Amino acid sequence: MVKKKVATKKNSPSLAIAKKKSRSNKDVVSVEAPIISSYNDRIRPLLDTVDRLRNLNVMREGIHLPTIVVVGDQSSGKSSVLESLAGISLPRGQGICTRVPLVMRLQRSSSPEPEIWLEYNDKVVPTDEEHIAEAIRAATDVIAGSGKGVSDAPLTLHVKKAGVPDLTMVDLPGITRVPVNGQPENIYEQISGMIMEYIEPQESIILNVLSATVDFTTCESIRMSRKVDKTGQRTLAVVTKADMAPEGLLQKVTADDVSIVLGYVCVRNRIGEETYEEARMQEELLFRTHPVLSLIDEDIVGIPVLAQKLMLIQSSMIARCLPKIVSKINQKLDTAVLELNKLPMVMASTGEALMALMDIIGSAKESLLRILVQGDFSEYPDDQNMHCTARLADMLSQFSDSLQAKPKEVAEFLMDEIKILDECKCVGLPNFIPRSAFLAILSQHVDGIQDKPVEFINKIWDYIEDVLSSVTAKRSDNFPQIQSSIKRAGRNLISKIKEQSVNRVMEIVEMEKLTDYTCNPEYMTSWTQKTSAQESFIDAVVKNENIPDYFSVTGFGNVKISHLRKYHAHLLIPAFDMKMRITSYWKIVLRRIVDNLALYLQLSVKSLVNTRFQKEIVAEMVDPRDGGGVEKMLEESPLVASKREKLQNSIKLLKESKDAVAAIVDQNC
């Protein structure tokens, strides 16, 4: 007697595989309606729990369930395998027979009468064994249309029958590359996309149906499963039509060129009018007596072995995944409840709306206080534009540098002073500088810079307006219906403050024209230092005509003096003195302008945050002449209403899912 060769794959470390008893063992499981009795009574509660979660559509919450996904190329014999497992007839014909995901729930029953029904589109349609194929076709036409197209909307088939294995499988359309008989041009893309969606999750077990008549390495279903399961840890292969291509089959399943870690099961398809019991008997006879097929290890042949393996794999996967599923359900439920609680309550009265508005403005005020006054930007750690005290300091520093930058000399040295003195002369003692002359040249200096402070203050308030808009938008995010009103109110407030600030800045600048005064001792120190070279300068201009045309003056560098030799000393002396006075005093003026603007800015910002913001925004929002912002809060925006409904539906689904798994988790604790 020839000793059989073993063609069994080594078991996956994570999923146990059952061994069938020897063919010589008299106690081998009897062949019932289609196959065998259930693995044990623990499978059914686990499977019912997962099926309950599947019916609840918990997958739409991003929670993947342990699923046996049946895939195969067109005409691979996929339908025959499922028929043999369930003991029922599925739609047959040319082209794609399965056009929607068919969720097959097989449940062992002690009743002699089978119960079969379909579920789709929230409907339950009872049927029987004789009419099941017809009922599936009719349901498929409702879901996917009466043509040849496919749909990803599932159809659930319940089979409660004596002798069936406790299994839930998802049968997907067979893979076809070339559209025929009115199929859509992108039929391959539609089917492959549907298959990838089901087999990609790590919780999916891939039942890959392969025909013994083809080279496994060329099968499209193998190529697709290897994309998501490169090592084959989640893939079990069923080799159909073993009786049609027995030669080389042993080598195929032994060599395992396509890396199927969960192993192979070789089966014989039901032929013609055979009953399922006759088909199983013929299958057992084939693998026991065929000169080639009998060499294949008995642990990997036959529909009963396939059913047993699938049940064990399924129960192991469910037991392994259930704690993770429970954890994900709890996590997503907590997140959904938290998100729902963050949404604004539905306003029932103007009083409630006003209170909500005060909360929005109050929280915005606190944010503005932190970022504009206290320098606390913890609320916006990564948004440097919202680090307001730093940005205001930057703008003030840039303004100071720009204001105090040394202007380019247009007139020749002392010529402006000489012209002013000439125009301001009067009958009186010589060598006295008329105050009017000093104020005249001071006014010229002020006129030269008067636009810069106004530009600076406008820039400051434009920036603060952007900040205020960002803060109020964030705080009123749950009330989009009033965001435009709050933004307009904020813009109006900043516009008023900006106008007041510009007027104040213009006053500060104008004051510098009217009075030449400072108590800063630096003025006298600087003037004394600069005038110390006056005598040598006058001598160089008036007495020493042979010296070079340039003279070094402290604070001015080398200045041209040849153009001054036509003037008398009694004019040059006051001109030089006034030049040194205005230069020393002008530095004081510029610093004073910067200081005054800095102090005024700080005062204005604090006034905005502490007093004006809340008072004026609320006043404008409650004024019916401005659109009645408070009344708008009574109308929940479509966006928030949609978000609320979605969260409420998610919470309902997740709570039901939590209840569904609670009992089974308690039993397994």
UniProtKB/Swiss-Prot annotation:
The GED domain covers 575-669
SMART domains on file = DYNc, GED
Q: Where is this region: G1 motif?
A: 72-79
Compartment(s): Cytoplasm; Cytoplasm, Cytoskeleton
InterPro entries from the xrefs?
Dynamin (IPR022812), Dynamin_GTPase (IPR001401), Dynamin_N (IPR045063), Dynamin_stalk (IPR000375), G_DYNAMIN_dom (IPR030381), GED (IPR003130), GED_dom (IPR020850), P-loop_NTPase (IPR027417)
Listed under GO cellular component are: cytoplasm; microtubule
Q: Which UniProt keywords apply?
A: Cytoplasm, Cytoskeleton, GTP-binding, Hydrolase, Microtubule, Motor protein, Nucleotide-binding
Q: Please give one Pfam family short name.
A: Dynamin_N
Q: Which family does it belong to?
A: Belongs to the TRAFAC class dynamin-like GTPase superfamily. Dynamin/Fzo/YdjA family.
- From the Swiss-Prot or TrEMBL record, give the protein name: Dynamin-related protein 4C
Q: From which organism does this entry originate?
A: Arabidopsis thaliana
